Amino acid sequence: TGKKEDKFGLTRKKFLELLKKYKSSKFINIICLSVHIGSQITNLLPYKNMLNVIKKIIQQSKYKFKYIDLGGGMGIQYEDNSNKLNYIKYNKLIKSFLKKNNSKIIFEPGRSIVGNAGCLISKIIYIKHTNSKNFIILDAAMNDLIRPALYGAKHRIIPSKINRKKISKKH
């Protein structure tokens, strides 16, 4: 999501054309401008850019939207070295936008708020040693957490219990 070539959404130009065509319709009542630039954004610049695009749409169309849906929420910090979004600055950015706009804001809570609510608990069954690399075999599978295999997502691994028990070497 978030790019012109993606399957969802419209370009700003196309949206303005449709808004002009339908804003005086007796059958269609446009009440919401909905945008979605992505769901794993961890810095403020894309949000600033998004709000500037929304401002331009409102200025160009002179249309009063009852709601503005800002789409996906803030990204989650999957790795210790990844960027973490500053909630205070994000809040100030939205408040600044609202000072000049009377629309009600809608947005998803985002992974940064809800993503840590779940965890996968697994145990090591055995370790497979090969000439090129070693594999830790768990009692969990891709159906439990497909994201790393599907698109290389990273998740922290935290041992719940550390013991020095030997794990059998099966091949």
Feature locations, PLM:
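Conserved beta-strand positions
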Residues: 35, 70-72, 107-109
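Glycine-rich and small/hydrophobic secondary-structure elements
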Residues: 88-98
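Flexible loop/turn segments at secondary-structure boundaries
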Residues: 39-43, 74-78, 113-116, 144-146
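Active-site-proximal beta-alpha core segment in soluble small-molecule metabolic enzymes
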Residues: 1-67, 76, 93, 125, ...
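Charged (often Lys/Glu-rich) extended helix/loop segments that serve as interaction or gating elements
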Residues: 93, 102-171
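C-terminal extensions
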Residues: 69-79, 84, 97
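Short glycine/proline-enriched coil/turn segments at helix->beta-strand junctions
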Residues: 62-64, 99-103
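Short glycine/threonine-rich loop-to-helix capping motif typified by GTGT followed
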Residues: 43-49, 78-89, 115-126
